[in-house]
Amino acid sequence: MPDPAAPAPPEAIVAFEQPDGTLIARWLCTPERLADLALGWLFCEGLVERADEVHELHLTPAGHVRGRLGDAARARLAAYDRDSGPGPARAMRDPIRAPVPLRPDEGTQALLADPGRLGDLFLELFDGARLKSVHGGGLHTGGRVVGGRIVDIAEDVSRSAVVDKLVGAARRQARSGEPASDGALVLLSGRISATIAAKLVRAGVAAAATISLPTSLAVDIAERTGLAIVGRARRETPFRYGGL
């Protein structure tokens, strides 16, 4: 049982602004790894396609994020603000385009077909969840798997922010201008919604696994785009959707 005296999971309102103060986005999230969150959000919303489209990204003294975007990204942002906006409806209304064809590599396909290995990875994921161990719950956890190893773990009160942080960290570590895909598998502790499925596709993530299930709209996105999803991934007979 969690300690009843344990501190509540941290949550804050974080603004993402352009240098002139124009608001790009506002999140309710766990205020950690905010640069990763901002960069990942840009990729996951389809606002940038390459890391070199973000010319500057830094934290302000007030704990917010300020970023300077290239011309192409600012044009996409203007269309996003005017016509779409964030949220579940956008995930189904707007065309969802991956930066590269989505197809898990052979190693990832073998991993997704092995419930024992997936189960071990989820145990490792939860063992490495630093904030969850401190706060006793109330946080979503995700991991990025490359070459069969977990290379990054992100935690947040927001499921969407977990995905943004994982993607942002991967793009920050990649060479400037490299295409937004590296064949990674994303592990998630929570339900995969249409919004999250759309984020994964736009970021070029080919495969995801969850201990929960995808929603029906997420399954629809997976089938249309080739995104591979494994649900109930710790069961002996998990469910498989999309590009599997």
Regions flagged by a language model, labelled:
Residues 145, 241-242:
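Short beta-strand-to-turn element immediately C-terminal to the catalytic PLP-Schiff-base lysine
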Residues 1-6, 178, 243-244:
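Short, low-complexity, intrinsically disordered N-terminal peptides in bacterial proteins
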Residues 159-241:
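Feature captures the catalytic cores and cofactor-binding loops of soluble hydro-lyases/lyases
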Residues 1-147, 152-157:
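Intrinsically disordered, low-complexity regions enriched in acidic/Ser/Thr/Pro/Gln residues
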